[in-house]
Swiss-Prot record:
Pfam families: Ribosomal_L9_C, Ribosomal_L9_N. One of its GO terms (biological process) is translation. The gene is rplI. This is Large ribosomal subunit protein bL9. It comes from Bordetella parapertussis (strain 12822 / ATCC BAA-587 / NCTC 13253). Keywords: Ribonucleoprotein, Ribosomal protein, RNA-binding, rRNA-binding.
Protein backbone atom coordinates (compact mmCIF):
# COMPACT_ATOMS: atom_id res chain seq x y z
CA UNK A 1 0.00 0.00 0.00
CA UNK A 2 1.27 3.47 -0.88
CA UNK A 3 0.99 5.98 1.98
CA UNK A 4 1.96 9.59 2.70
CA UNK A 5 3.78 10.04 6.01
CA UNK A 6 2.27 12.81 8.14
CA UNK A 7 5.20 12.77 10.59
CA UNK A 8 8.65 11.23 10.89
CA UNK A 9 8.46 7.48 11.46
CA UNK A 10 11.55 5.57 12.58
CA UNK A 11 12.97 3.18 9.96
CA UNK A 12 10.40 4.35 7.40
CA UNK A 13 10.77 8.00 6.37
CA UNK A 14 10.15 11.67 7.03
CA UNK A 15 7.15 13.98 6.80
CA UNK A 16 5.70 14.12 3.30
CA UNK A 17 7.42 11.08 1.84
CA UNK A 18 5.36 8.61 -0.15
CA UNK A 19 6.40 5.10 0.85
CA UNK A 20 5.19 1.56 0.26
CA UNK A 21 4.36 -0.53 3.34
CA UNK A 22 2.47 -3.72 4.08
CA UNK A 23 -1.30 -3.32 4.15
CA UNK A 24 -1.65 -4.49 7.76
CA UNK A 25 1.02 -2.09 9.04
CA UNK A 26 -0.74 0.80 7.33
CA UNK A 27 -4.31 -0.14 8.31
CA UNK A 28 -3.66 -1.28 11.86
CA UNK A 29 -0.93 1.10 13.02
CA UNK A 30 0.08 4.04 10.83
CA UNK A 31 -3.35 5.27 9.73
CA UNK A 32 -5.15 4.87 13.14
CA UNK A 33 -2.22 6.62 14.89
CA UNK A 34 -2.55 9.51 12.39
CA UNK A 35 1.06 9.00 11.27
CA UNK A 36 0.08 8.40 7.64
CA UNK A 37 -2.74 8.34 5.11
CA UNK A 38 -3.33 6.55 1.82
CA UNK A 39 -1.53 8.10 -1.14
CA UNK A 40 -4.41 8.96 -3.45
CA UNK A 41 -4.41 11.92 -5.84
CA UNK A 42 -6.84 13.84 -3.63
CA UNK A 43 -4.81 13.08 -0.50
CA UNK A 44 -1.59 14.23 -2.20
CA UNK A 45 -3.18 17.55 -3.21
CA UNK A 46 -4.62 18.06 0.27
CA UNK A 47 -1.27 17.23 1.85
CA UNK A 48 0.57 19.77 -0.31
CA UNK A 49 -1.99 22.40 0.73
CA UNK A 50 -1.49 21.59 4.45
CA UNK A 51 2.27 20.89 4.30
CA UNK A 52 3.37 24.11 6.07
CA UNK A 53 0.86 23.56 8.87
CA UNK A 54 2.00 19.96 9.39
CA UNK A 55 5.67 20.98 9.38
CA UNK A 56 4.92 23.63 12.03
CA UNK A 57 3.13 21.05 14.22
CA UNK A 58 6.08 18.66 13.83
CA UNK A 59 8.54 21.40 14.83
CA UNK A 60 6.46 22.16 17.94
CA UNK A 61 6.37 18.47 18.91
CA UNK A 62 10.14 18.23 18.44
CA UNK A 63 10.76 21.35 20.55
CA UNK A 64 8.51 20.03 23.34
CA UNK A 65 10.27 16.66 23.27
CA UNK A 66 13.70 18.32 23.41
CA UNK A 67 12.65 20.49 26.36
CA UNK A 68 11.36 17.42 28.22
CA UNK A 69 14.55 15.50 27.38
CA UNK A 70 16.69 18.28 28.87
CA UNK A 71 14.79 17.98 32.16
CA UNK A 72 14.74 14.18 32.01
CA UNK A 73 18.39 13.47 31.07
CA UNK A 74 20.31 12.17 34.07
CA UNK A 75 17.18 12.05 36.24
CA UNK A 76 17.37 9.39 38.94
CA UNK A 77 14.08 7.62 39.62
CA UNK A 78 13.73 5.67 42.86
CA UNK A 79 11.38 2.70 42.89
CA UNK A 80 10.75 0.55 45.97
CA UNK A 81 9.72 -3.09 45.57
CA UNK A 82 9.51 -6.01 47.94
CA UNK A 83 12.73 -8.02 47.82
CA UNK A 84 14.31 -10.99 49.52
CA UNK A 85 17.50 -10.92 51.57
CA UNK A 86 19.61 -11.80 48.52
CA UNK A 87 18.44 -8.65 46.66
CA UNK A 88 16.15 -10.36 44.18
CA UNK A 89 12.75 -8.77 43.74
CA UNK A 90 9.44 -10.52 44.28
CA UNK A 91 8.11 -9.68 40.82
CA UNK A 92 9.89 -7.22 38.55
CA UNK A 93 10.04 -3.57 37.55
CA UNK A 94 8.60 -3.10 34.05
CA UNK A 95 8.43 -0.18 31.64
CA UNK A 96 4.91 0.54 32.94
CA UNK A 97 6.29 0.91 36.49
CA UNK A 98 9.02 3.26 35.25
CA UNK A 99 6.53 5.37 33.25
CA UNK A 100 4.21 5.58 36.27
CA UNK A 101 7.12 6.65 38.49
CA UNK A 102 8.13 9.33 35.99
CA UNK A 103 4.55 10.63 35.84
CA UNK A 104 4.46 10.86 39.64
CA UNK A 105 7.80 12.74 39.52
CA UNK A 106 6.27 15.40 37.26
CA UNK A 107 6.98 14.06 33.76
CA UNK A 108 3.35 13.52 32.67
CA UNK A 109 4.17 13.25 28.96
CA UNK A 110 6.06 9.93 29.27
CA UNK A 111 4.03 6.88 28.23
CA UNK A 112 4.94 3.25 28.91
CA UNK A 113 5.45 2.61 25.19
CA UNK A 114 8.18 5.27 25.17
CA UNK A 115 10.25 3.59 27.91
CA UNK A 116 12.98 1.29 26.59
CA UNK A 117 14.73 -1.13 28.95
CA UNK A 118 17.84 -2.48 27.18
CA UNK A 119 18.33 -5.37 29.62
CA UNK A 120 14.65 -6.30 29.89
CA UNK A 121 12.65 -6.18 33.09
CA UNK A 122 14.50 -5.35 36.29
CA UNK A 123 14.53 -8.31 38.69
CA UNK A 124 17.11 -7.28 41.30
CA UNK A 125 17.98 -4.33 43.54
CA UNK A 126 20.43 -1.81 42.03
CA UNK A 127 20.92 0.99 39.49
CA UNK A 128 19.81 0.43 35.90
CA UNK A 129 19.98 2.63 32.78
CA UNK A 130 16.68 3.19 30.98
CA UNK A 131 15.88 5.21 27.87
CA UNK A 132 12.79 7.30 27.17
CA UNK A 133 12.17 7.72 23.43
CA UNK A 134 10.21 10.99 23.42
CA UNK A 135 10.33 11.57 19.65
CA UNK A 136 11.87 9.81 16.67
CA UNK A 137 14.94 12.07 17.08
CA UNK A 138 14.92 12.61 20.86
CA UNK A 139 16.05 10.03 23.44
CA UNK A 140 16.54 10.78 27.15
CA UNK A 141 18.64 8.64 29.49
CA UNK A 142 17.24 7.97 32.96
CA UNK A 143 18.76 6.02 35.85
CA UNK A 144 16.34 3.78 37.76
CA UNK A 145 17.40 3.05 41.32
CA UNK A 146 15.55 0.00 42.62
CA UNK A 147 15.44 -0.25 46.40
CA UNK A 148 14.31 -3.36 48.19
CA UNK A 149 11.73 -3.44 50.95
CA UNK A 150 11.91 -6.36 53.33
CA UNK A 151 8.96 -8.62 52.75
Amino acid sequence: MQIILLEKVANLGNLGEVVRVRDGYARNFLIPQKKARRATDAALKEFEARRAELEKVQAEKLAAAQALAERLNGFQLKISQKAGVDGRLFGSVTNADVAEGLRKAGFEAVEKSQVRMPNGQIKAVGEYPVQAVLHADVVADVVVLVEGEMA
